[in-house]
Amino acid sequence: MKTLYLIRHAQSAANAGGISLPDREIPLSAAGTRQAAELACRLPENRRVFVSEMRRTHETAAPYCARHGVRPEILPCLNEFSYLPFAAVQGLDAAARKPLAEAYWQRADPHFRAGGGADTFAEFDGRVSDFLHRVWPALPHGSLLFGHGIWMALLAWRLSGNRAETGADMAAFRAFQSSLHIANASVWRLDGTEAAAESLRCLPENAAEF
């Protein structure tokens, strides 16, 4: 058996309602910086650390890496779903971004690209598939993966036996994701065999099962 730990990044400036930045450049908020420092004390010692290409995962992992002298390794397949192009949201706060996000999901087209630099849902699902089929077997037991909320929700969706290929699949996933609470700085345990991931569950803050 193998276990990995998925950590959603700490609160970002976007989570706190801030003005839009390019997705890869979004930093942590002041509250997120405190959450990251708390995680460094909570997580198990001396583990391999993997992050997405997004700044907020790097900043979340940084206190742990500094504490244990670990260098984070980048896994592009962990990148969050970036479905709104920066050109469409530049200068907007969270409230102003919301109707654009709702319109995207209501379209329910897995192959629709909203603009330059944006992902399609099919591409996003491909990243999660890459993680499940290629990356999982290669990762060492006990590794820490700092990632993102929608990504973790799609992983949970796929592990439950659901598909993410059609417009109906996409709409059903959105309803599932909207009802699944994945808090900033929460830690999730991903269990499976050496060949395949099987189950994902959230650990309580006082978990002693690392």
Language-model region placement:
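Extreme N-terminal starter segment of soluble prokaryotic enzymes
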Residues: 1-5
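Active-site-proximal alpha-helix that buttresses catalytic centers in soluble enzyme cores
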Residues: 7-74
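Short active-site segment of divalent metal-dependent hydrolases/proteases
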Residues: 12, 151-152
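Phosphate-handling substructures
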Residues: 27, 66-127, 179
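Glycine-rich phosphate-binding loop signature in dinucleotide/nucleotide-binding domains
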Residues: 43-45, 135-141
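Short, well-ordered beta-to-alpha junction loops that form the rim of enzyme active sites
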Residues: 52-54, 77, 142-150, 157
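Active-site signature of alpha/beta-hydrolase-fold catalytic machinery across serine-
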Residues: 63, 154, 158
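Acidic, low-complexity terminal tails and accessory targeting/binding regions
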Residues: 81-95, 157-210
